């Protein structure tokens, strides 16, 4: 049977079927010197059938990145047109998985967090005119236990997207560590563990697309030095990527089949629906929606729920008007157009009146309150109210044997004793979803921000396992950083040893996008972004970029910057956002320090003993798992943890007791008993 008959029963209407032909590949290699290490960028040698491929090496670390775009236009929601998947293989370090089937299973938290970081760094610079979904696959081919993979993954993904022609300009990434007032570029994992601060910076020629900072209470001046140092190295990486990309011919998306063409060929599939607003559509949406939108944003007496319901009504009414006049306007397109209009309206209303939608000034934070020990059976609990945002944090403390060995083959094992989870059900933002309690990339990423904010002030000698759970009961913006202060208070209520109290806040910037300027015939040059402290939900979802910051009275512990739309912010704008946020944090700490806490009775103190096992006997130690270990634990009233690499840690009430248990275990190994 012919291909034409398979596609449409012979009804081709005289149209010739065009097949995608990949561009001719040439091998290009570039080396960038970064401090004491060299970053090798290659393309054109591996994965030649992909739209774009990149091979990145640093030391023994090797990452393969491939980029593919869908061959047909997307007709569903494309709020996240870039999908990133990062996978680690135990074979990258010459190991065999210890799972029953001896292969890797689902995504680990490390893989989810790395995928999320890469996606956040690159999504803002994806070509908005591209109607095709893009997928980036990152695979760890060879591991270097002295180097982390985050920045190499961003560089590999950016180069692959650049070769594929689906990104506006290359993005480079680098890690900077502050070790004893000395800045180290791309530090080793051991150096990062002892560093006073570390910064993951991703950006292009004009500014930053992602900033991830965690430190042991660093000052703003030290942070600024790290930002400028990182920016100078990123520019070199971006230039090297641009030189490589210039050697490849990008395949134009118009050469692929669109939905209209496939529909004419007889395939039963949905017609193409554009999702990028045009100037004419933006003008029409503004004419229809502007009066009601201004009323919603200027009514300071309205509640958060009232504003959300008003926005939903506005979206429905605007859609009803526009979809009644044209069959080519989708609801997704209307939503995107409204988002662009809202950014400009927020900007204009604040410029005109000096007030925001809830009546506050641009740099005014909401009043906050904290109530501790509201859950009697929980070790520690705190309810925080920040305007109409409510966060309930609960803390449980257990024995240290409940800690987990993390890292595994790839990153080196370490003992994690603080576990943070963050959840925001759909009811918190007055919506309904198919599954309200789904824990995915977003939740893992938000929990990591809270963990990075609090962990620098934890006492390293605290020998207990801590679980902190943050429930966002209602969210009118700032739902992540609003959980930092109550989380700290809940941990203190549970008896956790902390050096100082921590608080967090968010700062976002609103600025009319380039599309709006073009629609109005204005110029974007010279337009400064407007900073908004402690944003509401509407402001948070319709800003250009947002910065989350946490810190103590002594210094900053965490910073996270995300670019949502528009051009990347330069470093001087980031400095202004940091100053505004940290000033607010120090003011909020005055309120938090006044909260009185009566700690619960601490858990019985226990002793830890780590046993050094010769490399030749580690397999025998692993084989002891089961009844033999259970008998030893029962006999000596202790807990024994054995990792997949044969590392043994014993927990008990006395050191003599643990010494006897370890001797018994080693005797079993010597006798060869399992």
Question: Which residues fall in each region the model found?
Answer:
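N-terminal mitochondrial targeting presequence
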Residues: 1-31
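Extended amphipathic alpha-helical scaffolds
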Residues: 23-70, 74-81, 252-415, 604-631, ...
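Conserved structured catalytic cores and adjacent interaction surfaces
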Residues: 436-439, 443-556, 561-674
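Long, basic N-terminal domains or extensions that often function
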Residues: 26-78, 83-259
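Flexible, glycine/charged-enriched surface loops at secondary-structure junctions
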Residues: 29, 125-134, 168, 237-257, ...
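Stable alpha-helical structural segments in soluble proteins, enriched in small hydrophobic residues
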Residues: 121, 152-164, 226-229, 233-237, ...
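Mobile "lid/hinge" segments at catalytic clefts and subdomain interfaces of large enzymes
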Residues: 164-295, 491-599
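Glycine-rich, flexible beta-strand/loop modules in the N-terminal catalytic cores of phosphate-handling
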Residues: 50-134, 140-142, 205, 223, ...
């Amino acid at each position: 049977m012919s291909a034409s008959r398979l596609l449409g029963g012979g009804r081709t209407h005289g149209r010739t079927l065009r097949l995608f032909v990949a561009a001719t590949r040439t091998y290009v290699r570039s080396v960038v010197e970064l401090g004491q290490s060299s970053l090798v960028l290659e393309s054109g040698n591996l994965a030649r059938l992909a739209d774009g491929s990149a091979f990145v090496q640093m030391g023994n670390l090797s990452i393969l990145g491939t980029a593919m775009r869908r061959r047909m236009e997307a007709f569903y929601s494309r709020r996240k047109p870039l999908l990133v998947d990062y996978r680690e293989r135990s074979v990258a370090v010459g190991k065999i998985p210890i799972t029953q089937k001896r292969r890797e299973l689902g995504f680990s938290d490390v893989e989810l967090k790395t995928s999320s970081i890469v996606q956040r760094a690159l999504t803002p610079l994806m070509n908005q005119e591209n109607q095709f979904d893009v997928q980036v696959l990152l695979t760890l081919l060879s591991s270097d236990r002295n180097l982390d993979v985050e920045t190499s993954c961003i560089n590999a993904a950016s180069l692959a997207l650049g070769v594929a022609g689906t990104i506006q300009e290359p993005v480079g990434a680098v890690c900077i560590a502050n070790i004893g007032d000395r800045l180290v570029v791309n530090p080793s994992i051991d150096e990062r563990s002892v560093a006073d601060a570390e910064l993951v910076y991703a950006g292009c020629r004009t500014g930053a697309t992602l900033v991830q900072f965690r430190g042991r209470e660093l000052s703003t001046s030290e942070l600024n030095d790290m930002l400028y140092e990182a920016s100078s190295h990123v520019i070199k990486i971006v230039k090297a990527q641009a030189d490589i990309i210039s050697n490849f011919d990008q395949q134009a998306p118009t050469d692929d089949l669109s939905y209209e063409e496939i529909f004419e060929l007889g395939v039963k599939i949905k017609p193409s629906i554009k999702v990028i607003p045009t100037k004419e559509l933006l003008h029409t949406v503004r004419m229809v929606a502007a009066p009601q939108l201004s009323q919603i944003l200027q009514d300071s007496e309205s509640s958060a729920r009232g504003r959300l319901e008003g926005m939903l009504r506005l979206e429905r009414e605007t859609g009803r008007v526009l979809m009644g006049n044209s069959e080519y306007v989708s609801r997704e397109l209307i939503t995107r157009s409204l988002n662009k209009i809202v950014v400009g309206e927020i900007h204009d209303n604040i410029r005109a009146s000096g007030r925001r939608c809830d009546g506050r000034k641009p740099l005014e934070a909401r009043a906050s309150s904290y109530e501790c020990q509201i859950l009697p059976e929980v070790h520690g609990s705190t309810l925080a109210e920040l305007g109409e945002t409510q966060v309930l944090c609960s803390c449980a403390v257990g024995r240290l044997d409940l800690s987990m060995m993390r890292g595994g083959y790839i990153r080196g094992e370490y003992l994690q004793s603080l576990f943070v989870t963050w959840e925001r059900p759909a009811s918190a933002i007055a919506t309904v979803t198919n599954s309200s309690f789904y824990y995915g990339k977003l939740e893992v990423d938000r929990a990591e921000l809270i963990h990075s904010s609090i962990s620098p002030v934890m006492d390293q000698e605290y020998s207990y396992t801590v679980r902190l759970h943050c429930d966002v009961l209602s969210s009118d913006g700032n739902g992540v950083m609003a959980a930092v202060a109550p989380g700290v208070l809940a941990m203190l209520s549970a008896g956790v040893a902390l050096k100082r109290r921590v608080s967090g806040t968010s700062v976002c910037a609103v600025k009319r996008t380039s599309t709006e300027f073009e629609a109005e015939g204005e110029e974007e040059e010279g337009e400064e972004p407007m900073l908004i402290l402690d944003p509401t939900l509407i402001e948070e979802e319709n800003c250009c970029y947002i910065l989350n910051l946490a810190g103590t009275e002594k210094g900053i512990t965490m910073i996270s910057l995300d670019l949502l739309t528009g051009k990347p912010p330069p470093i001087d704008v980031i400095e202004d956002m940091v100053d505004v946020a940290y000033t607010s944090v120090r003011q909020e700490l005055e309120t938090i320090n006044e909260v009185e806490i009566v700690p619960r009775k601490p858990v019985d103190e226990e002793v830890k003993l780590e046993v050094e096992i010769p490399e030749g006997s580690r397999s025998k130690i692993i084989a002891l798992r089961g009844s033999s270990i259970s008998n030893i634990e029962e006999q000596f009233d202790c807990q024994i943890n054995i990792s997949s690499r044969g590392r043994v840690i014993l927990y008990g009430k006395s050191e003599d007791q643990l010494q006897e248990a370890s001797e018994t275990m080693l005797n079993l190994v010597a006798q060869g008993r399992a």
